[in-house]
Amino acid sequence: MKRARVVTLNAALGPLDYRVPEGMHVEPGSIVVAPLGPRQLLGVAWESERLPTNEVPDSRLRPLAGLIDVPPIAAPLRRLCEWTADYYLAPLASVLRMVLPSSAALEGSRQLIEYRPTGSVPPRLTPQREKALAALEGRQGTIRELADHAGVSDAVLRGLVNAGALEAVAVDADRPLACPDPDFAPPELNEDQQEAAASLASAVGKGFDPVLLDGVTGSGKTEVYFEAIAECLRQGKQALVLLPEIALTEPFLKRFEARFGCQPVAWHSDLRSSQRRRAWRGIASGEAAVTVGARSALFLPYPNLGLIVIDEAHEPSFKQEDGVQYHARDTAVMRGKFEDIPVILSTATPPIESKQMVELGRYREVSLTERFAGASLPDIRAIDLTQDPPPRGRWLAPQLVTEIEANLDRGEQSLLFLNRRGFAPLTLCRHCGHRFQCPNCTAWMVEHRLMHRLACHHCGHVMPPPKACPECGEEDSLVACGPGVERIADEVAELFPDARTAIVTSDTIWSPLRAAEFVGAMEA
C-alpha cells in the first residue's frame, strides 16, 4: 500500500498521512483533496522524510479523495516554502496558501460564449445597428468586448443577436497568452548601458547570481534589465519582475509592451477572480513567459523560472505586514538560490543590507553612474522657513509659490510631496486642549476631510469627526493642526484657481486602474 504525507491548507493542522488509492499517481508536490472528518481539504503531498509526524498504522489511513489536474509544485518552490516558514516563524500551511491563492484556478477549463457576425442583415436596421455591424466585421468576442469596440451599448448587440445578425460561439475561456518578442523593439543604449546589459544578460542560464543594479535616477536601469529579460526569453525560460506597489503596474506594463510587443501577465490583489485564475494557470503551465506583480507573485509555481528582477529594491513596501510577515526582496534572493538562477536588485538608493552583501562578495554590483542621454540631475535648493516663512495660516513658502507660478506660466507641471496622508495630523480642542488619540494605541487621530473621518495610521481605527469636544463638551471648538496632503491641495487650489490639481495617495489611488487614469491625465 502506498502512503502520502500531506500538508493541508489548514494552518492548525500538522502534516497528515493518507492512503493513495489504486490508479492515483501522487508524487511530492502533487495537489490533492484530503478528507478530514466530514470535510474535504486541499493539500500538497510532501516528502515524508522532510516532515516527520506520528506514524499511523496502514489500517487506519483514509484514502485521498482526489488529485487536482495541475502540475505538481516543483522541488525548488517546496524548499522555498520550508525556508520561509522556518525563517519567518510561520505555519507551512500559511505559506502554501500563497502558492495556491485561488481555488478557482485549480478547476478545469471553462467555456465562454462569444459572438460573431453571421453576414445577415436584420430587418430593422437602425443607425446604431448599422454602426455596430460595420465595426464588427471579421471580429469575435464577448458582448462587452464587442460593444466597447463598436462604441454602442450592450442592448444594441443583444438586439442583433435576437435578429440573427450575430451568432453565439462557445470558446475556451483560457485564451492563449501573448508571447513577448525579445527582438520587437531593441533600445538604443549608450556605452555604459550596453556594458551593464551585457553583464546582466550573460548571467542568465548560468546559475545563482544575485546582482545589485545600482544606478542614479534616470540612468536607464529598466532598459538595462529588460535586456536580461530578453535573453531569458530567448532561452525559453520564464521571468518574474516584482514591483513594490500595484499602482506602479499599469505604467510598467506600457513600457514593457513598447519594448516586447505585448503586455506580460500581471499579478496583484486588484485582479478579478477570473483574471487570477487565468494568470495562475498560465504561470503554472509555463505558458506565461513574463510575470509582473507585487510581493505575492514571488510564490507562484513557475515551472521554468530563469530570472527574477526586484524593481525599486529599496522600497519598504516589499515587507508583508499581515498574514505571513516576510520580506519579498530577501525571499526573492532565496528563491533564486533554490532555483539556481540570477536575481537582479534594481535601485537608485541601495539598501544598506544589499551594499553589505556586495562588500562581503555575496552579491555582484553593476553600476550606472550617468543619466540617460546626458540629462543632468535636478537643481536642488533648500528654503529656510525661518528666513522666508509662509504667511500665517499658509504652508507653502513664498519662494515655492513663485516657482510654481512661473512653472504654470511656462505650461509646465509641478509635483508637491508631503509624507502625510489626510488633511491634518492632529485635531485638538481650542477650549480645553484635548487631543484626539486612538483608543487602541494612543497614536494621534489624523483628519481625513475628503472621507469625513478621523483615522489612526498606526492600527487602522476610524471614527466620524465629532461635533463637540468629547472631553469638555464645547461645540465648534475643534481645530485641525498641521498640514496633510489634502490641506496643501486646498491651499494650491486657492492660490492657483485656474490650475488643474490632483491628490495622489493610497486614499485616492487604490488600484492599477486608478493609477493608469491618473498617469493618463498627467500625460494628456
Please annotate each region the language model reported.
Residues 400, 409-494:
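Cys/His-rich short segments
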Residues 229-230, 388-417:
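Conserved interdomain hinge at the start of the Helicase C-terminal
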Residues 293-305, 492, 512, 519-524:
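SF2 helicase motor core recognition
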Residues 181, 377-399, 504-506, 514:
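Inter-lobe coupling/hinge region of RecA-like P-loop helicase motors
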Residues 1-347, 354, 359-375, 409, ...:
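Accessory, non-ATPase domains that flank or precede helicase/AAA+ motor cores in DNA-metabolism machines
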Residues 240, 260-271, 439-440, 446-449, ...:
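Conserved RecA-like helicase motor-core motifs
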Residues 272-284, 500-505, 509-524:
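Conserved helicase ATPase core of P-loop NTP-dependent helicases/translocases
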